[in-house]
Structure formats: C-alpha cells, structure tokens
C-alpha cells in the first residue's frame, strides 16, 4: 500500500494574503484541490492523508475533500508548530503502508511520472526525492557582500517533493530526530541523519511550489498551458 501525505498546514507569509496559500483559488479552484487531484488520479496511490491547521480541518473537509469527491482521502490531521511536527502527525495517522510520499500542498504541478518514479526508487533504495539542477550560477557570498567562490552547479540539486520513503524507515528516522531534538528543513535531511541514503531523481521545473505572488502568476500561466482541470 502506498500513502500520500499532503502538507497543508503552513501559512505562507510570503504570499502576503490573509488566508492559507493552499486555499487560494486559481481559475475558481483551490491550489490544494489541484494537488490532491494528482494523487487521487494515480493508480499507485491507495490512500491520502492531509495535514492541515486545526482551525482549517473542517473547511478542508467540506470545501475540498467532499466538494471534489476525493475518496482516497482517509484522514485529515492537525499540524504542529513546525513542519517536522506536522509530518510526524501525518506519519502517525498512517494505518498501513509500504511507501509514503510526503508532498507540499502548494505544489500542484507534480505529474504521474514523478509519483511513479518516487515509489519505484523508494522501494529500491529506501528513500528518494525528486528535484532539478539549478539553472543559475551559484556563488558563496562573504559576510561583507563579496563573492568568495563559484560552486559547480552540476553537483547541486534543488530538492522538490514528493519525498518518498519506506514507511517504517522514515517513521523511525522522525522518532529518532524527535528524541535527539533535531530540527531539520525537510524529510530527506531527517532520513540522512539516521544513517540512510536518499536517491535523487529527476523532477520538473514545472513542479514549482507556490510561495510568492510571482509563483501564483507562474502557476496561472502553467494552468492555462497544461489545461489542468
């Protein structure tokens, strides 16, 4: 069984709106609904768990899950004060799974190939994450504002989601991080801190996370281009 955990508890202050960015409408439909739909349509996903702010759980259930008939959504759980705690709450809500895919609710352009490859590589290696190589030249900047070094971008990788893992392994890694007081920026970091390796595979430049007003404009353009419904 494969379970997708959709992270939708973040506020997104950089969007400069008075609502959760995942509930912003694009062509009359919430961003989160587009995201969930990608996993709803995947034949490899058996169930979906949404992690939302406690105050928004009822709205999420009524205005997204019921409204768009997402019958693979089995539970909506409340998030924690940090993303790491929110993921842990989502993992604890999983009743039975071989592979879990942890995905940003504000990343609606994930495609089925990315989902399929994530499951395939997680089964093979234990952990996998999609992403892309940076397009820009990357510099190390000194404290006084000058360039210190140019990084070989062929060795760099901008990690996206989904981040996919064998369920027992990522749960154990999160438990270890919690016990040791480790606060990580994403789940690959937590997985690696437990002595595991993460296989990195090709994502897509279109698999953007909607974080700023500019991202929202780009998403609207992509939506028109791809005719996502």
From Swiss-Prot:
InterPro entries: IspD (IPR001228), IspD/TarI (IPR034683), IspD/TarI_cytidylyltransf_bact (IPR050088), ISPD_synthase_CS (IPR018294), Nucleotide-diphossugar_trans (IPR029044). Its EC number is 2.7.7.60. Belongs to the IspD/TarI cytidylyltransferase family. IspD subfamily. It comes from Clostridium acetobutylicum (strain ATCC 824 / DSM 792 / JCM 1419 / IAM 19013 / LMG 5710 / NBRC 13948 / NRRL B-527 / VKM B-1787 / 2291 / W). Keywords: Isoprene biosynthesis, Nucleotidyltransferase, Transferase. The record marks 153, 209 as: Positions MEP for the nucleophilic attack. The keyword Signal does not apply. PANTHER family: 2-C-METHYL-D-ERYTHRITOL 4-PHOSPHATE CYTIDYLYLTRANSFERASE, CHLOROPLASTIC. This is 2-C-methyl-D-erythritol 4-phosphate cytidylyltransferase. Pathway: Isoprenoid biosynthesis; isopentenyl diphosphate biosynthesis via DXP pathway; isopentenyl diphosphate from 1-deoxy-D-xylulose 5-phosphate: step 2/6. The gene is ispD. Pfam families: IspD.
